[in-house]
């Protein structure tokens, strides 16, 4: 409960840094300026003579006071020296702010406590510095510095406060109670010191709980913004800080502190309120007397100088002990700033040597057994070591080890800094995990089945060879390998081994990666019989200025010039003031086919469905299947006894095929209750139409129907697109309109909309096959402007089938691309808005691609650019294909 309160407090402070900082500073200034608590304005030496104070000062032990000040300065110096070993300038700066502001707050409290008498600070500040503890402040700063984003900074500060807050609160309470015992001693000088100590602890606690976390959050936020959103504070050796700080304090120690606190509270209560005050501690009952400010012995005098001149003269006139203290502080400051920086950097470089180029770790083999990681620097060494490893495996009898340990460590990022010897040591430490030794020869199937079915053992106690043996014997279905293995990756690895033996070239899968992939998001959602994943280059085009916003559009493609061309179109649109877009319609469709005994029956059912009563019945059944699916309309056609019903419904942020299919099935069941003679032939009767060219999608629309437009100034057409408005309009008419009509195209009145649609679909986890209908587009160009030299362009796409949840959008790389566009996941405030926004981005990017390609065609640059940028430089004669090998 207490940790939760501190967590909420930390999150609030980190989320509102400006408010907390301004409020804290304002409160401090008010404490300095207000005069309600101390009614008298007596200042010793200026308007009052304080003979007792002067006598005490003259009789005080100057040597001890000087030593105390020097020790305090050395203590702060060593604390900052320890912070420098962390290697982060941000921790140093934040700790400095913490110290300065804590001193400021403490000075304010002391001034008020002494009735605005600044001479008390001379003895107070050393005790404050001795009680300053930067360890917790630096620990909280390290929590924040281990973050990757500003949101994570706030969350980590909240976690740090939840962990450190209760401990720090208890420690501050215990310190105040322990030090406060000295205020009851009756010794005036000890009472003053203990009073200063208590105020020091309280000031430190106040700053740590308010100003400091807000300052940390604000500093890191400003640092992030100064580098275009990239976190510049994160250090590699902070990666483990959360694990280290998560260790809770010793509960025994905490209980002892609590018991001590209760005991000290009783002591204070008894001494201050229950016991009779004795003459020896009567000074403790009167703060004025205990602090040597007895007004009975003070005499008022007329000031000879102004107050600021009085304070200035006291600051300039320094005693010998003050000169010693100031000299030591300046000497340590110079040493810390100028002479220790190189030494610290040298020490850090020895701890974390960085060499360039960085050695990378490659996985070599694709066999069933674990093998030590091999470090390679070039392909020649890679193949030589691979061949040697294969020969050694043939000659030697090895102990087969399952992939469990490797898979457990494979998901942790391995950062290699330093030389290869250090790397080898780190790899050995990582791989030293408990492993069971398995026999080289496969055991009988019966024994293997018993181990597999044993809940305490399972597949991790079987070698890959034994698993393959069970698959070949039909005891394990090949499609269930991932679910039966201890890790999905091992199941994929075994399937690759099974498949490699059946391929014309056993090493065919060598360059198809499969490691370090989150297959849990794939199984049962995206793919079956997985043997790896296909890396595709992802480029970015942008910024695309659309509806007053800028988007960096990810495009996954292997076609050269595509991203560059689209990027040029985005630049032209941006220079023209940006594009505007609107969503005309939003509705996914599913078109089942049902059959009736006679054609007249089909016609009658069609007529009934067109009535408000019939539509209401079907809509209620359809809408009951989902909180997002809402039937909009029915479009029907009769072909003999067959009735084709096209259901159109919104689907939120999902593309919606599964959602609409579920609603369609429920609606057909309801329709069958009214017409029992109806026969459901198929939930999909190709009347949708999905993944096939269809005029109904072009005319009626499917998914999101979007229109996008822009005006490109004549200067941009000439200087960026390298052509003229007249030439582009002429090419557009004769190519995109007349040419497509001559070819009998359906929805293909564009230059290459499918290129952009498919590239974005692959990058953002969409169904790539739906580029067939989604690429329906008509591109229109007109002359505009006062002189008709500007270019007006529009793209209308009536059937963009797209979504931001479900399917491939659940995969992390695809989610990253969606996050680039700000449309990842479902929109909570307005369901479906993310998908509609993505459709507008697709249409706007298509228009950019159309603009650039049409300009290249008009200027005659297309062939030349592709010859330069889209031609492979590999000598194909040096590559032997499968047919060549067979012929040889």
Swiss-Prot record:
Positions carrying Phosphoserine: 872
EC number assigned by the record: 1.1.1.34
Description of activity control: Regulated by a negative feedback mechanism through sterols and non-sterol metabolites derived from mevalonate. Phosphorylation at Ser-872 down-regulates the catalytic activity.
SUPFAM superfamilies: NAD-binding domain of HMG-CoA reductase, Substrate-binding domain of HMG-CoA reductase
Active-site residues per Swiss-Prot or TrEMBL entry: 559 (charge relay system), 691 (charge relay system), 767 (charge relay system), 866 (proton donor)
Cytoplasmic side: 1-9, 79-89, 150-159, 221-248, 340-888
Keyword Lipid biosynthesis: yes
Annotated TM spans: 10-39, 57-78, 90-114, 124-149, 160-187, 192-220, 249-275, 315-339
Bilayer topology: Multi-pass membrane protein
Placement of sequence motif INSIG-binding motif: 75-78
Position(s), cross-link Glycyl lysine isopeptide (Lys-Gly) (interchain with G-Cter in ubiquitin): 89, 248
Recorded catalytic activity of this chain's protein: (R)-mevalonate + 2 NADP(+) + CoA = (3S)-3-hydroxy-3-methylglutaryl-CoA + 2 NADPH + 2 H(+)
InterPro entries xref list: HMG_CoA_Rdtase, HMG_CoA_Rdtase_cat_sf, HMG_CoA_Rdtase_CS, HMG_CoA_Rdtase_eu_arc, HMG_CoA_Rdtase_metazoan, HMG_CoA_Rdtase_N, HMG_CoA_Rdtase_NAD(P)-bd_sf, HMG_CoA_Rdtase_sub-bd_dom_sf
MF-aspect GO terms: coenzyme A binding; GTPase regulator activity; hydroxymethylglutaryl-CoA reductase (NADPH) activity; NADPH binding
Subcellular location per the Swiss-Prot or TrEMBL entry: Endoplasmic reticulum membrane; Peroxisome membrane
EC class name: oxidoreductase
PTMs per UniProt: Undergoes sterol-mediated ubiquitination and ER-associated degradation (ERAD). Accumulation of sterols in the endoplasmic reticulum (ER) membrane, triggers binding of the reductase to the ER membrane protein INSIG1 or INSIG2. The INSIG1 binding leads to the recruitment of the ubiquitin ligase, AMFR/gp78, RNF139 or RNF145, initiating ubiquitination of the reductase. The ubiquitinated reductase is then extracted from the ER membrane and delivered to cytosolic 26S proteosomes by a mechanism probably mediated by the ATPase Valosin-containing protein VCP/p97.
Family assignment from sequence similarity: Belongs to the HMG-CoA reductase family.
Assembly behavior: Homotetramer. Homodimer. Interacts (via its SSD) with INSIG1; the interaction, accelerated by sterols, leads to the recruitment of HMGCR to AMFR/gp78 for its ubiquitination by the sterol-mediated ERAD pathway. Interacts with UBIAD1.
PANTHER family hit by this protein: 3-HYDROXY-3-METHYLGLUTARYL-COENZYME A REDUCTASE (PTHR10572:SF24)
Role description: Catalyzes the conversion of (3S)-hydroxy-3-methylglutaryl-CoA (HMG-CoA) to mevalonic acid, the rate-limiting step in the synthesis of cholesterol and other isoprenoids, thus plays a critical role in cellular cholesterol homeostasis.
Protein name: 3-hydroxy-3-methylglutaryl-coenzyme A reductase
Annotated source species: Bos taurus (Bovine)
């Amino acid at each position: 409960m207490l940790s939760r309160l501190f967590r909420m407090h930390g999150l609030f402070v980190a989320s509102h840094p400006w408010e907390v900082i301004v409020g804290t500073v304002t409160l401090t200034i008010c404490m300095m300026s207000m005069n309600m608590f101390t009614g008298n304005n007596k200042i010793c030496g200026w308007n009052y003579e304080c003979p007792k104070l002067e006598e005490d000062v003259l009789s005080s032990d100057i040597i001890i006071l000087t030593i105390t000040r020097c020790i305090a300065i050395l203590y702060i110096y060593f604390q900052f020296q320890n912070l420098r070993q962390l290697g982060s300038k941000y921790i140093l700066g934040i700790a400095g702010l913490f110290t300065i502001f804590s001193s400021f707050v403490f000075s304010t409290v002391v001034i008020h406590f002494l009735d605005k008498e600044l001479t008390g600070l001379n003895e107070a500040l050393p005790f404050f510095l001795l009680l300053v503890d930067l360890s917790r402040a630096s620990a909280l700063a390290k929590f924040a510095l281990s973050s990757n984003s500003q949101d994570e900074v706030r969350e980590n500060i909240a976690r740090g406060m939840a962990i450190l807050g209760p401990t720090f609160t208890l420690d501050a309470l215990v310190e105040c109670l322990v030090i406060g015992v000295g205020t009851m001693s009756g010794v005036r000088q000890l009472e003053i010191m203990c009073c200063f100590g208590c105020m020091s602890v309280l000031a430190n606690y106040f700053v740590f709980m308010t100003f400091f976390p807000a300052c940390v959050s604000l500093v890191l936020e400003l640092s992030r913004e100064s580098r275009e959103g990239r976190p510049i504070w994160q250090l590699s050796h902070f990666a483990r800080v959360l694990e280290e700080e998560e260790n809770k304090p010793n509960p025994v120690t905490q209980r002892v502190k609590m018991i001590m606190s209760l005991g000290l509270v009783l002591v204070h209560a008894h001494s201050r309120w229950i016991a009779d005050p004795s003459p020896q501690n009567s000074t403790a009952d009167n703060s004025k007397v205990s602090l040597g400010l007895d007004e009975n012995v003070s005499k008022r005098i007329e000031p000879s100088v102004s107050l600021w001149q009085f304070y200035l003269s006291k600051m300039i006139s320094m005693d010998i002990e003050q000169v010693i203290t100031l000299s030591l502080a300046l000497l340590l400051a110079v040493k810390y700033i100028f002479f220790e920086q190189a030494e610290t950097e040298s020490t850090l470089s020895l701890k974390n040597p960085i060499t360039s180029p960085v050695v990378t770790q490659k996985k070599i083999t694709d066999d069933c057994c674990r093998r030590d990681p091999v470090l390679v620097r070039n392909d020649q060494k890679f193949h030589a070591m691979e061949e040697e490893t294969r020969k050694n495996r043939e000659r030697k009898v090895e102990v087969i080890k399952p992939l469990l340990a490797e898979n457990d460590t494979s998901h942790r990022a391995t950062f290699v800094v330093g030389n290869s010897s250090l790397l080898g040591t780190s790899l050995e430490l990582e791989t030293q995990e408990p492993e069971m030794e398995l026999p080289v020869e496969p055991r009988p199937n019966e024994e293997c089945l018993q181990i597999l079915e044993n809940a305490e053992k399972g597949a991790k106690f079987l070698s890959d060879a034994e698993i393959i043996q069970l698959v070949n014997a039909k005891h394990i279905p090949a499609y269930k390998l991932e679910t039966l293995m201890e890790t999905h990756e091992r199941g994929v690895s075994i399937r690759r081994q099974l498949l490699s033996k059946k391929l014309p070239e056993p090493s065919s899968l060598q360059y198809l990666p499969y490691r370090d992939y989150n297959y849990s998001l794939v199984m049962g959602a995206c793919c079956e019989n997985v043997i790896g994943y296909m890396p595709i280059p992802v480029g970015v085009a942008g910024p695309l200025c659309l509806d007053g916003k800028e988007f960096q559009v990810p495009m996954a493609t292997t076609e050269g010039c595509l991203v560059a061309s689209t990027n040029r179109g985005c630049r032209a649109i941006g220079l023209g003031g940006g594009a505007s877009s609107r969503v005309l319609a939003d509705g996914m469709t599913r078109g089942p086919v049902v059959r009736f005994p006679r054609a007249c029956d089909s016609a009658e059912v069609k007529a009934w469905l067109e009535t408000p009563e019939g539509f209401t019945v079907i809509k209620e059944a359809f809408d009951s299947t989902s909180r997002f699916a809402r039937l909009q309309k029915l479009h029907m056609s009769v072909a003999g006894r067959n009735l084709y019903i096209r259901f159109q419904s919104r689907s939120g942020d999902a593309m919606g095929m599964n959602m609409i299919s579920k609603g369609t099935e429920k609606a057909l069941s309801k329709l069958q209750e009214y017409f029992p003679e109806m026969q459901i032939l198929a939930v999909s009767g190709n009347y949708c139409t999905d993944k096939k060219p269809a005029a109904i999608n072009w005319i009626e629309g499917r998914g999101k129907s979007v229109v996008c437009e822009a005006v490109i100034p004549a200067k941009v057409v000439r200087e960026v697109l390298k052509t003229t408005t007249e030439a582009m309009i002429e090419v557009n008419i004769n190519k995109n309109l007349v040419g497509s009509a001559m070819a009998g195209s359906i929805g293909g009145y564009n230059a290459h909309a499918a290129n952009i649609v498919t590239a974005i679909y692959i990058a953002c986890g969409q169904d790539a096959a739906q580029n067939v209908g989604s690429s329906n587009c008509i591109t229109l160009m007109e002359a505009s402007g006062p002189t008709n030299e500007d270019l007006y362009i529009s793209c209308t796409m009536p059937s963009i089938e797209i979504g931001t949840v479900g399917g491939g959008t659940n995969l992390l790389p695809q989610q990253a691309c969606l996050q680039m566009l700000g449309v990842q996941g479902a929109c909570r405030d307005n369901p479906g808005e993310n998908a509609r926004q993505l459709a507008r981005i697709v249409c706007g990017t298509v228009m950019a691609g159309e603009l650039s390609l049409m300009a290249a065609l008009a200027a005659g640059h297309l062939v030349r650019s592709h010859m330069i940028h889209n031609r492979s430089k590999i000598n194909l004669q040096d590559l032997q294909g499968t047919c060549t090998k067979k012929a040889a």
